[in-house]
């Protein structure tokens, strides 16, 4: 059913009564005609006020199924604004002002079984609200007069200005504009022609044109509806001047107050308010404050708000779990029984209404308050089982043995839900620990110390679980839960172990091979397994030892030497392996440490073994040191002596002991020749028995400068003799002569080759692509050229201009061709050299030279020869009639013919 407001009950009853009276005749006629399933009216009408509230009934639509007992479902076309219940009563779905577009909608009725559908139109007529006169702020048009000026005793005295009361104008006024407010007049308008004007905000200042004044009559008017929320008061000033613009009256101030109307709906600062309340809170506990604001005047009822709770979801544990202060908006608890495990969140619909909460004239708005019930620790954790079981192999650590599960009704992942586990019994040695899984809140029983199966094979642990925070007072449950964990240890094949490990023995060096050192045996921790152990060598750097694979006897295979490089600080380390016969086999390692005791088995020697001394030493002494691989007492102090043989050793040298390890070798004579001397020195250690050794000290005698050896003298002594220098010079001269002769021979060979090429027999000079294979520099691809280029060499494009000295001798010159004079006579046969040179020069300057330096072809005329038939040539008998001067134009190759048959008198 729609929620009926008390103030609308008479209206609803009237509407229902009218509908009943209106439908009476129809029902009376039901027996006289066939019944039709559907709505009883084609159109339903309702008359309501514009502002409606949520749940307010508007009208009742009637539907008949003609006694078929149909299951009818109703629905409106605008469910956001209107809803209909099963009895056909149409109610407002929310609080709002009905607009003309919303005043008409459809109501649907559908058979839930057959899905048959009917509909009807609903039209709502909006009734005006009967309120006090909205225009009570308008006073009857009155008149405001300017104060007059009087004269007293010949002086003009101004009358005190009147105090003009404010003019009240309601906002949002309706009607035609401009609307007259007040008339302004001066007493002097009877004698003068005056002009009236107003100034100030709303007149000649922004907002412009809100107020205007008739300049002749002085009537002040407002031009449009006012809005108090924008400007609550206007301050204007009225002026009166004559036609010349001279002020005739003092300006008067006019105050226009905009009267507030209830035209603003309350607005909540937030549409959704969130708050929290701990579960189990007592009645009267503060939750939160909701706030709404109203744009109307807060000093008037239009802006005075009142709050109330329209609904609470869910309604358990109490339908009125919360209440609200209607003036402040404070929400507090009204009833007890807040339990987060039952209801985690409450949703309240809060309504704010102006007009001090008057449901008839006030405007309302709603917001949602979401109140979350926060958790407190009112539920302890409880184990899901009384006993948990687990197993773990022996000697394993950081292994999860068992997973303990608990349940807690408090909010997950909070201190009231997080579990803390403790072991309170069965683990006296502290081999187990329990960690909490942050996600699942389970307890993970973990092994933190190795467990030996042979020592203990079963553990019974007693564990408890509790929350991170204490339970609140008044809870009847125990704060903790107890369970038992049974852990079984699994036996595994363990590694054999040597004892002791490492094993240290002391042994004098020099022990021969095959001697028994010690027994190094291992034990098997698996007492309940019948297994054998075998031994092997894992590490023996000097290869001095061997171990018996059955009993672990260690014997030597070489002489033990303390001075070996494998011995560090008198200690020699060897590693051995013990392996059992299990499946799979397990092994363990053991280290044998042999501390070698020193014996006197190393003779001392001198250090350094080579020194330098000046030929005239000053001081004439050398410091030497004795070294011994043995250690005390088999080393120093040492005895230094010079042998008696050879005799010159003691004659020239003497040795003096400075300390137990140091001595000084001195020169007895004043100087020595340059050279190298080997001085024998006999050194004896302090061992028992003592060991002696003769060491040779290499002494280099050299020339000294400022006490240090110099290399000048040896260099001078190694100079070359005169004969060697002369021999070197002769060799150099001979080499230069050979090079010069080779160069001269090469030049002569080049000249002979060039002369031979110019003196080729004319019979052999065919040049028909003759290819030479007996010379370097080219093959067929270099000399097999196009004959057309030889027939017409003038068509060949000249190459890029080359500097002098770079152009080939057979290239065509790019400058003008020289004019050759006609020879008067053939050269003398003896002048062959000049003939060759002239021919060479002419060939070099021949403009028709081929592009390659090779033999040319002269007997190939080809097609289209310009020579014509040979029959056209005249015989020698007609030489007087022939002109052979054109032979001079054919180049040097026809120069001989030109000389023989030319027109010269010679």
Curated annotation (Swiss-Prot):
Keywords: Calcium, Cell adhesion, Cell junction, Cell membrane, Cleavage on pair of basic residues, Glycoprotein, Membrane, Metal-binding, Repeat, Signal, Transmembrane, Transmembrane helix
Propeptide span(s): 29-160
BP terms from Gene Ontology: adherens junction organization; calcium-dependent cell-cell adhesion via plasma membrane cell adhesion molecules; cell migration; cell morphogenesis; cell-cell adhesion; cell-cell adhesion mediated by cadherin; cell-cell junction assembly; glial cell differentiation
Compartments in which it is found: Cell membrane; Cell membrane, Sarcolemma; Cell junction; Cell surface
Residue ranges of the TM segments: 725-746
Domain Cadherin: 161-268, 269-383, 384-498, 499-604, 605-714
Residues covered by region (Disordered): 775-800, 863-884
PROSITE patterns associated with the record: CADHERIN_1 (PS00232), CADHERIN_2 (PS50268)
Extracellular side: 161-724
Pfam families: CADH_Y-type_LIR, Cadherin, Cadherin_pro
Membrane topology annotation: Single-pass type I membrane protein
Glycan-carrying positions: 274, 326, 403, 573, 623, 652, 693
Segments in the Cytoplasmic topological domain: 747-906
Residues annotated for Ca(2+) 2 binding in this entry: 171, 229, 260-261, 263, 296
SUPFAM superfamilies per record: Cadherin-like
One GO cellular component term noted in the UniProt record for this chain: apical part of cell
Signal peptide bounds: 1-28
GO MF term set: beta-catenin binding; cadherin binding; calcium ion binding
Biased composition (Acidic residues): 776-785
Annotated Low complexity bias: 863-880
Binding site for Ca(2+) 1: 171, 227, 229, 263
Gene3D superfamilies associated with the record: Cadherins, TCF3-CBD (Catenin binding domain)
Domain notes: Three calcium ions are usually bound at the interface of each cadherin domain and rigidify the connections, imparting a strong curvature to the full-length ectodomain. Calcium-binding sites are occupied sequentially in the order of site 3, then site 2 and site 1.
Subunit structure: Homodimer (via extracellular region). Can also form heterodimers with other cadherins (via extracellular region). Dimerization occurs in trans, i.e. with a cadherin chain from another cell.
Reported function: Calcium-dependent cell adhesion protein; preferentially mediates homotypic cell-cell adhesion. Cadherins may thus contribute to the sorting of heterogeneous cell types, and thereby play an important role during embryonic development. Required for proper neurite branching. Required for pre- and postsynaptic organization.
Name used for this protein in its record: Cadherin-2A
Organism of origin: Xenopus laevis (African clawed frog)
Gene: cdh2-a
